[in-house]
Curated annotation (Swiss-Prot):
It comes from Yersinia kristensenii. SUPFAM superfamilies: Urease metallochaperone UreE, N-terminal domain. SMART domains: UreE_N. Residues 188-228 are annotated as: Disordered. GO terms for biological process: protein folding. Keywords: Chaperone, Cytoplasm, Nickel, Nickel insertion. This is Urease accessory protein UreE. GO terms for cellular component: cytoplasm. Gene3D superfamilies: Urease metallochaperone UreE, N-terminal domain. CDD domains: UreE.
């Protein structure tokens, strides 16, 4: 096993390493978003090198990090991180709204995202939400809950990662693919009782199949079951 305790540089950010590795062969250490948040792990590179990562606890691997460099054979071990795409919700337009409207919208947005069990980080007047379902479903949730006036877009996770602190990156990307996914695509306003939070749900196990939930809820004056 080759022990990696330090990051030599980054081929995507450091001009010196970009020049040094211009004609080099890359032996990639491919990590998913959960593995990338760990300062200690053991994994094989694409060319079969047994790598033991043992970094300081505050250090998080980034896409393009150079972990080893064999100058004689011109082979570099480089990190490749496969991050999920991210939905970016722009809250800037709320600054022109009244304080009451701003508070109401932010509360309702937080409730809607939480109701989906979606992780989120708020920074620079934006909300970052890692994709756990198809973009069409996330788009539907935003529009069905009445947030179409808030600009939102879908970007690569690698674009967002540099904007985050280590703790924010762990919150946003660490293990997002392991969470159960609930997609609620109907507005509470559509319910005849107004306050009912029962919405058709799709439950994904991450293994390629999903199923609907049958469950009951209360409208305050009576309880009943719903079956889909």
């Amino acid at each position: 096993m080759i022990l990696i305790e330090h990051i030599l540089g980054n081929v995507k950010k450091d001009p010196i390493w970009q020049e040094k590795l211009k004609d080099a062969t890359f032996d990639l250490l491919v990590l998913d978003q959960r593995e990338a948040q760990k300062s200690r792990c053991r994994k094989l590179s694409t060319q079969g090198l047994d790598l033991g990562i043992s970094l300081d606890r505050h250090v998080v691997l980034a896409d393009g990090d150079v972990l080893a460099w064999d100058e004689k054979n011109r082979v570099a071990v480089v990190v490749q991180i496969n991050l999920r795409d991210v939905m970016v919700i722009d809250l800037s337009e709320l600054k022109s709204r009244s304080p009451d409207e701003l508070i109401k919208t932010c509360f309702e947005l937080g409730h809607a995202l939480g109701n989906q069990h979606w992780k989120a980080v708020t920074k620079h007047n934006e909300v970052y939400v890692p994709l756990t379902v198809a973009t069409t479903m996330m788009d539907s949730v935003m529009r069905t809950h009445g947030f179409q006036h808030l600009p939102f877009r879908f970007v690569k996770g690698a674009e967002i990662l540099p904007l985050l602190s280590n703790s924010e990156a762990r919150l946003l990307f660490g293990g997002a693919e392991d969470t159960d996914t609930h997609v609620h695509v109907a507005s509470p306003l559509d319910e005849p009782h107004g306050s009912g939070l029962h919405i058709h749900a799709i439950h994904s196990h991450g293994d390629g199949h999903s199923h609907d939930h049958d469950h009951s809820h209360s409208h305050g004056d009576h309880d009943h079951d719903h079956k889909h």
